Amino acid sequence: MIFKNKSKLILIIGGILVYLASAGISYGAFRFLGSGSSLLSPVDITPGSGFKIDPNAPKTEACPLTGQLFTKAEKQIWEKRRPLTVMIENHADSRPQSGLSKADVVYEAVAEGGITRFLAVFYCNASEEVTVGPVRSARTYFMDFASEYGDYPLYAHVGGANVPGPANALGQIGDYGWLDKGNDMNQFSIGFPTYWRDYERIGHAVATEHTMYSTTEKLWEVASKRGLNATDEEGNKWNAKFTEWKFKDDEKLEARGTTSKIDFSFWNNNPDYAVTWEYNKDQNQYLRVNGGQPLKDLNSDSQIQVKTVIIQFMKEKGPIDEVKHILYTTTGTGNALIFQDGKAIEGTWAKEKRQSRTKFTDGSGKEISLNRGPIWIEIVPSGQKANY
């Protein structure tokens, strides 16, 4: 091709050079952002900025959910979003799950047939992107627990119970205003790439129901696009009605107790779902054993460990319909056991209504201060025993 117009030729060549330069810059930028950076939200909450937390920075900022201390940079992250709750399954074939070690609070209860399920609450301890799953379906009583984290907590799940009557979780999501508000994070309405299936996640093929995955950052990104950050589009703060628990520091080593093991079952004769928490006195942590095996997080290959284990004994009803759904009486009062510092505290739980914070009190009626750090709450049917 021969160009007779030199000005035109110069413009074309200049355009090509600008394109190549910008492409090179973009390529370099994307390589930088993707080169091992498991970032989640940076301080300025710009996804993909490559921001990482300095592990040596002072930890001075208390998480409102657990009292655990984090850096100022991490606080800048969580202050710009709202808690994310995720339904994660615990079928024996789904283990090890992903993300549980990064949850601030985990609730565990039977979903059906003696098989338990988790509601994992992510907020302060997920400043870096956390892969979560397998994600499973909604249950009404887990929504009662999620409701403690604001009127419109982010609730991630894959479908849910959809039957006439009190177990109608999908119907209740609409009744609570979660569909209209947009805090319902149902995979059925969001889909790929926020959610995806991984059939080889644990090194071998598993049934389809054990394959749904997401990440905390992908879910928070969807929420942000819907105007649900720390405040909503009307300026309402997620924590305007949120009640914090009371927290305390660990007991000194010499003051710690000798309760070294906690054993219980949700249902009898169901060994795959029997739970043991083993106390490490030096670390002042409780390590989880499930079905006789250490329960690990697939992301890190580390055993699940928490600072406080709470057993809430709760009235179980059901099966209440032909598809064997069960319910728990999540409001009112009941007995509780609180394990921390190697000690067992016999107490009481109380919750006034769905959106109320569950409170834990000792025998004198005083609210129990919980150790700073991850908390695991076990919803065990009334009448079951815990050995310790």
Predicted feature descriptions by range:
Residues S7, L11, R31-G34:
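Short hydrophobic helices that act as membrane-entry/anchoring signals
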Residues I2-F3, I10, L40-V105, E112-Y388:
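A surface/extracellular/periplasmic glyco- and lipid-processing/surface-interacting theme
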Residues A23-S38:
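Membrane-interface motif at the C-terminal end of an N-terminal transmembrane signal
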Residues F3-N5, G28:
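Short alpha-helical segments used as structural interaction elements across diverse proteins
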